[in-house]
């Protein structure tokens, strides 16, 4: 057993030795192989390094050659540029030399001319002195006297020219102002369309039949007397079929009588007690209508915040007329026109409309107020807390007080436009013709008047005067005298323009 173990140990030792020997040999071979590979790699690296070195040297030589070539080219370019500068400097120097020579020649020429001019000046001064002395001897005037005369003549000419220029500018300004005002007024009129109802002093009430006339008269005329007493209106019952005429200069009374009579006709019961009842109802109806008309006028014109009493006065204007023109419709139209013109001029439109609407409220009061309606209207507006501008526009629209605002001027202009519009106001044909004849008669009554023409429906009269009998100052005086005479002797709506024309003609012939 021990022998077996020993044999095993020996075998293991032999095997181990053999393995060691083989491993050592293999390691040796591996080392030799690695040494060969390293040697080959070293030689290869040397060859590559040598090749890289040669390439770097070649590249460096090429770069040096290129830099040298570029440097040589730059040097040549700089040298050429320097040569060009040198040539230009030489040329400029030559040019400056030539200019210097020319300047020297010109200076010599100028010096010669200066000497000649100085000699001429001395000669002129000598001649001037001789001529001045000769002129003084001939005219017997000293130089100061002649200078004074010349200055006076120049002053007269300048004064005349300045006067002509001022006159021309004034004429042009007036023409432009007239053109602008016409344009503003025309635009306002074109944008304002208002209707007018011409009122009369009578009203016709239709009857269902002629038997109703007897019932209206009543026994012994007591019904008609009662109605006339309560309303203050005259009832005219004549041969007109199926109609009764109410006559009164007070439109409100006439309207009360009309409403009461129509109610009685519809009711059929006509006696004094019933008449009194119907008249009371008619009065209330008219008062309500007055209030509604005043409110409607403020609504149409856009005027708000009026005192209730002012609104009532406006409503009463429906029953007032001026030369046949309804005063309420006229006031509404004036409000429109004043507002439109104010908008064109950039003024206070609301103020102009308010003053235009209220300008005739003085016509809405009864007889207890005395004085011009414009002044009364201004006092009423002040009483009911209207602004000072509105009060002034109302009081001044007929010239009773001085105008303080531009809106007041517009109200006056709008009032004149509304009144002067064709068809707005009327008068009888006979009175119209007589008024025109009287106008021309007044004009021709003055000495020196050649012809006179009443035009523009009697709102202007043109008077042709004889220039050899009436001078410019006389024409102005004649116009003023005619104005005074017309105001004293005639009654007319609106205003009348007096145009005195003096014409002088100078005729000659060119041959």
From Swiss-Prot:
Q: What Gene Ontology terms for biological process does this UniProt record contain?
A: mRNA catabolic process
Q: Which UniProt keywords apply?
A: Cell membrane, Endonuclease, Hydrolase, Membrane, Nuclease, RNA-binding, Transmembrane, Transmembrane helix
Q: Mind telling me which InterPro entries this protein's record contains? A: HD/PDEase_dom, HD_domain, HDIG_dom, KH_dom, KH_dom_type_1, KH_dom_type_1_sf, Ribonuclease_Y, RNase_Y_N
| Residue ranges of domain KH in the record | 201-286
Q: Which domain of life is it from?
A: Bacteria
Tell me, what does this protein do in biology?
Endoribonuclease that initiates mRNA decay.
| Name this polypeptide is given | Ribonuclease Y
From what organism does this protein derive?
Clostridium perfringens (strain SM101 / Type A)
Q: Which gene encodes it?
A: rny
């Amino acid at each position: 057993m021990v022998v077996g173990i020993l044999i095993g140990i020996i075998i293991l030792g032999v095997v181990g030795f053999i393995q060691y020997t083989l491993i050592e040999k293999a390691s040796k071979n591996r080392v030799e192989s690695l040494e060969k590979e390293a040697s080959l790699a070293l030689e290869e690296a040397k060859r590559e390094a040598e090749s890289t070195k040669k390439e770097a040297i070649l590249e460096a030589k090429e770069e040096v050659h290129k830099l040298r070539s570029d440097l040589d080219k730059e040097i040549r370019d700089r040298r050429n540029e320097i040569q060009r500068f040198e040539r230009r400097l030489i040329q400029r120097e030559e040019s400056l030399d030539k200019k210097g020579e020319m300047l020297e020649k010109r200076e010599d020429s100028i010096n010669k001319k200066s000497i000649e001019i100085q000699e001429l000046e001395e000669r002129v001064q000598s001649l001037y002195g001789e001529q001045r002395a000769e002129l003084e001897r001939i005219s017997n005037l000293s130089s100061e006297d002649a200078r004074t005369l010349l200055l006076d003549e120049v002053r007269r000419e300048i004064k005349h020219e300045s006067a002509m220029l001022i006159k021309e500018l004034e004429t042009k300004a007036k023409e432009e102002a007239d053109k602008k005002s016409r344009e503003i007024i025309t635009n306002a009129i074109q944008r304002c369309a208002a209707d007018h109802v011409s009122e009369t002093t009578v009203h016709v009430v239709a009857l269902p039949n002629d038997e109703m006339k007897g019932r209206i008269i009543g026994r012994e005329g007591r019904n008609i007397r009662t109605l006339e007493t309560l309303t203050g209106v005259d009832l005219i019952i004549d041969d007109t079929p199926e109609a009764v005429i109410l006559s009164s200069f007070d439109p409100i009374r006439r309207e009360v009588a009309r409403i009461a009579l129509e109610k009685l006709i519809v009711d059929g019961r006509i006696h004094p007690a019933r008449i009194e009842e119907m008249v009371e109802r008619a009065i209330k109806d008219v008062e309500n209508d007055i209030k509604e008309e005043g409110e409607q006028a403020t609504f149409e014109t856009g005027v708000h915040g009026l005192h209730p009493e002012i609104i009532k006065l406006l409503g009463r204007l429906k029953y007032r007329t001026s030369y046949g023109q309804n005063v309420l419709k006229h006031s509404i139209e004036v409000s429109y026109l004043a507002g439109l013109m104010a908008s064109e001029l950039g003024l206070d439109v609301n103020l102009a409309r308010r003053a235009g609407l209220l300008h005739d409220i003085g016509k809405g009061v009864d007889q207890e107020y005395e004085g011009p309606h414009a002044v009364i209207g201004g006092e009423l507006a002040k009483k009911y807390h209207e602004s000072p501008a509105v009060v002034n526009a109302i009081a001044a629209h007929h010239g009773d007080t001085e105008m303080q605002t531009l809106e007041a001027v517009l109200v006056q202009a709008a009032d004149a436009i509304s009144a002067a519009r064709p068809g707005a106001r009327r008068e009888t044909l006979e009175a119209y013709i007589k008024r025109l004849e009287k106008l021309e008669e007044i004009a021709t009554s003055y000495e020196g008047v050649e012809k006179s023409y009443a035009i523009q429906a009697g709102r202007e009269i043109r008077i042709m005067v004889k220039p050899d009998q009436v001078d410019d100052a006389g024409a102005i005086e004649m116009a003023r005298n005619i104005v005074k005479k017309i105001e004293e002797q005639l009654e007319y709506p609106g205003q009348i323009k007096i145009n005195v024309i003096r014409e002088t003609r100078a005729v000659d012939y060119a041959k």
